[in-house]
């Protein structure tokens, strides 16, 4: 599973000219699912995301989590996170899971993340052509590559 976590002042996703989801201060998360991803990866990642201390405390030190600031989360499915550009000039997405695997895992990830956050999260629409806008705060951007089910591949 590949995840890009961006600390944001606000973010939104628009589909066919209509705003589907919008958030204020929090995280805008891009998530790419692989064939080998599973529930263990989702559980670990959701716990990690809500406990990441990347928001400033009263002293300007990144010491608060999204739970501490009562922040919001917007999650966007992004199979292109699995692009391989080693050969040629056209990216290969062979590592990205097929929709029959990735859709249920994406939905489970969103459900578990919402539960861990303690409130609803915003989402895009799997497979849709989306326009995503955000103000990256900091900027703070964290790339997380995780395979709990395959410890030797842990990044």
Question: Where are the language model's segments positioned?
Answer:
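Short beta-strand segments
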Residues: 6, 32, 77, 133, ...
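Compact, glycine-rich, soluble single-domain proteins
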Residues: 19-70, 80-111, 116
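Residue-level signal for inorganic ion chemistry
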Residues: 45, 76, 140
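Single conserved hydrophobic/aromatic residue that forms the stacking wall/gate
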Residues: 146-155
């Amino acid at each position: 599973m590949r995840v890009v976590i961006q600390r944001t002042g606000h973010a939104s996703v628009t589909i066919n000219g209509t705003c589907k989801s919008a958030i204020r201060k929090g995280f805008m998360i891009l998530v790419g699912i692989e064939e080998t991803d599973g529930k263990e990866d989702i559980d670990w990642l959701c716990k990690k995301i809500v406990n990441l201390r990347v928001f400033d405390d009263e002293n300007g030190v990144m010491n608060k989590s999204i739970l501490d600031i009562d922040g919001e989360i917007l999650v966007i499915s992004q199979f292109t996170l699995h692009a391989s550009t080693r050969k040629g000039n056209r990216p290969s997405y062979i590592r990205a899971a097929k929709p029959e695997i990735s859709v249920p895992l994406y939905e489970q990830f969103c459900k578990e993340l919402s539960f861990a956050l303690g409130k609803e999260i915003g989402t895009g629409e799997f497979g849709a052509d989306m326009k995503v806008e955000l103000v990256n705060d900091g900027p703070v951007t964290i790339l997380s590559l995780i395979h709990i089910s395959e410890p030797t591949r842990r990044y």
